[in-house]
Amino acid sequence: MAALCVLGLSEVNMEMTIEKQKAVADDVLHKLFLIQPYAIVAGGAPRDWLDGKLATDVDVFVDTRHINTAKKERELFAVAGLLRFEKGEGRDWDDIPEHYKKNPNIKRVYNLEIDGVAVQLICVKCPCWDVVEQFPIPICQAWYKNGRIGTTLEYKLCKKVGALVITNHVY
């Protein structure tokens, strides 16, 4: 397994805020822009931020359809200034939560910590925007990009009626 050396860690973990989580998300998306301008933060973090809550982690979805090996993904993330890799092979699927393994669009997941914020780079084999609409629970169909949070119509309907429903059985 590859040894990950995370760049951008702070020595002092200041009190966590939604603004700090968004700043880390903005920084990651900015660093990814040249290699993948369509990367987005999606799922739980934008949903939690809309509800005024801290997110447990920030999931950054990166379209890596054009990249056929984990080594090339790691090299691109290193060029973006997000990772520095030492000798090793790549992520082991045993370390990845089961719900990610069930999603047919996810290729690999890289776990990072940046300035005290847990960040997951989730490599997908489809356009990032497609991932959002395929989330099986509409309350997770939210995304963050360019300082703004967006949601699907299904998300808005679920929030309005206060119901938790499953609308997609892709995984």
Q: Across the structure, where does each feature detected by a protein language model lie?
A:
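Catalytic cores of the polymerase beta-like nucleotidyltransferase superfamily
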Residues: 2-171
